[in-house]
A protein has these predicted regions:
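Adenine-nucleotide phosphate-binding core of ATP-dependent small-molecule kinases
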Residues: 208-240
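A short acidic Gly-Thr/Ser loop motif
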Residues: 19-36, 40-43, 68, 258-260
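Phosphate-binding glycine-rich/basic clefts of nucleotide- and phosphate-handling proteins
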Residues: 39-200
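A short acidic (Asp/Glu
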Residues: 5-8, 37-39, 75, 262-269
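Phosphate/pyrophosphate-binding loops at sites that engage ATP/ADP/AMP, CoA/4′-phosphopantetheine
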Residues: 11, 234-253
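Glycine-rich phosphate-binding loops at beta-strand->alpha-helix junctions
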Residues: 150-154, 251-270
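Nucleotide/phosphate-binding catalytic cleft detector across ATP-hydrolyzing
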Residues: 1-26
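Conserved phosphate-binding/catalytic loops in two-lobed NTP-binding clefts
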Residues: 1, 270-281
């Protein structure tokens, strides 16, 4: 709600609000693990010294299984596949091959087939990569403790590295290319350092901790393609009913909040349902 008050304050400064006229706003908030959709109806009265704001709120929709962590997980999947390929496992498709498969009319594909099918090939190759670099630590609960913690460490090391990659691409830096390496010497700009002695790979029947890992590179356009399906999927889930019922026309503006909503892909996906001028960050 504080976000909306700030927006109303800005609109008052810009003199774009009329006294006693009713406005409706739609707020999409994408946090780390959940995403919520709320509507607000408000009007203002000028009390000379201050404005009085009358407001009603309603919870419209939500997804407790989608948030910024989902986007990080997708980057982690690609990172894991890239590392496995660099280690010499050619049974797993390359990142380029996977993304070429996904490079279609993404929005229309998801409209027809859904998000799950869009990522089906990626999921298939990610599972193959498990044979070299395991991360499904729940599957190791009945193994010895040493292997369980090695696999758990694999998951969190890759996930935290993926989070750093996401911040470089979508933070203030706005990197176009990111290098992941375990070597400190001769680092390029926009490098994520993956600590040595962190990842364990299968060697025969044993999990072996590797001192270093191969250097891999990722570029912005690959990540945009990778994440566009997830982001359009959640926007479609929230907006489609409002769009087809015509209720979307009742809203004066749509406000995107939360760190993940700063990614332009959210705005691009929303433009499938509303004019771009309605969207605010």
């Amino acid at each position: 709600m504080a976000v909306l008050y700030n927006t109303i304050s800005n609109m008052l400064e810009q003199e774009t609000l009329e006294e006693n006229e009713e406005y409706e706003a739609l707020i999409i908030d994408c946090g780390g693990g959940t995403t919520d959709l709320c509507s607000y109806r408000f009007r203002i009265q000028d009390r000379r010294a201050a404005y009085k704001i009358y407001m009603e709120t309603a919870y419209e929709n939500g997804d407790t299984d989608f948030g910024g962590n989902n986007l990080t997980y997708r980057i982690m999947q690609i990172l894991k596949i890239a590392l496995v390929r660099a280690k010499g496992n050619q049974n797993v498709s390359s990142v380029k091959e996977i993304l070429e498969y996904m490079d279609t009319d993404i929005y229309r594909f998801i409209d027809s087939h859904g998000v799950k099918e869009f990522y089906q090939y990626l999921e298939q190759e990610y599972q193959k990569a498990e044979e070299t670099l395991p991360t499904r630590f729940a599957d190791f609960e009945r193994y010895n403790r040493s292997e369980y913690y090695k696999v758990k460490n694999n998951f969190y090391t890759l996930f935290n590295t993926a989070e750093q990659i996401k911040k470089l691409f979508y933070g203030k830096v706005g990197a176009l290319e990111v290098t992941v390496t375990s070597e400190q010497k001769g680092q390029r700009e926009n490098t994520v350092l993956l600590d040595k002695w962190k990842l364990s790979f299968w060697k025969g029947d044993s999990l072996t901790v590797e001192k270093t890992v191969p250097e891999v590179m990722m570029n912005y356009f690959e990540i945009e393609l990778l994440l566009s399906g997830e982001i359009y999927g959640i926007v479609q889930k929230f907006m489609e009913e409002l769009y087809h019922s015509g209720r979307i026309q009742d809203f004066s503006f749509i406000k995107l909040t939360g760190q993940s909503c700063k990614i332009d892909l959210f705005k691009d996906a929303l433009k499938e349902f509303v004019p771009g001028r309605m969207i605010q960050f």
